[in-house]
Amino acid sequence: MATAVLSPMTIPGLHTAPSKEDLEKAALAYNLLHDDKDQPEIPPAHLKEITAIIVSHNVQEKFGIHLVHGHLQVDQGKVMHGTAMSSLRGCWTRPTDISGLDVGNMHGHILALSSNGEFQAYEYRQGAPPLMSPNDNAFVVALRAYLQKHCLGSLIGLQVLDEDKDKQLQEFVLGDNNGAVMLDAEDTKITQSYRVTGYVVETNESGVTELKGKETHAPTIRETHQVFTDGKPLPDEKSLVNALRADGVID
C-alpha cells in the first residue's frame, strides 16, 4: 500500500514564529468572529469523531479543540495576546501593541480555518511555537479535512495546550476592550458555568475516552461572565485583580 505523503506545511504561530503581518491578519480574523452567545452548541457526534482523530494520532497531550468565538474589536496595530499572571493562577489575554511584542517568544494558542481553508491563529500566547512532528502535521491535516467536510470551520478551532490543560478553567470577559481572563476554577468564588469553550481529551474512571469541557464561561454576581470596569482601562495586573474582586469573582 502506498504511503500518503503530506505536502510541506507552515502555519505561522504553529510551525514558525509569526511576522508583524501575520499578527495583523490575526487581529482582522478575530474581529470577524461571532460572540459565543451567537454560536450553536457543538454536536456530541462531532465531539466523538474528533476525539477519535485526536486519539488515533496520539496528540491529546498537545492539542485540544476550542469553540471559535470573540468578544471585542481589536484596534489596528494590536493583536490578542495572552500572558501568565503572577498573583493568580491564570492567563490574561488582551489587545496588545504588536510593536512591543517579542515575536520569537509567542505562539498561536487558538487557530481557526480561514477563507483559504488553512488554519490561522487568532489568539496568541507567550512562549515559542511548539515543535511539530510529521505525526502532528498529519493530525492537523486530518482535523482540517474533518472540519471542512462537515462545514465546521467557523464553529470549531484548534487549540494548542499548555501546562494548564488538566485544570478546570473559567473565563471572564473584561469590559471596555480589556480582553478576557482565564482563571483556575479553584481560585474563584464562582461555582456555576454555562458554556463550554475549550475541550481536552480525557479518560474517565470507567475507561471512557472523550473530549471533556475544561474551559467554561462562568457568571459573576451580575449574572454575566463579563467583569465591568466602569469605562476604565486596566493598565496592569493589580487593577485587573481589583476589578475581579469588585465583581465578586475572587476574594
Regions found by a protein language model. Name each.
Residues 2-36, 66-251:
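Detector for the mature cores of small, proteolytically processed
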Residues 44-61, 143, 150-152:
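Short, low-complexity, charged amphipathic interaction modules
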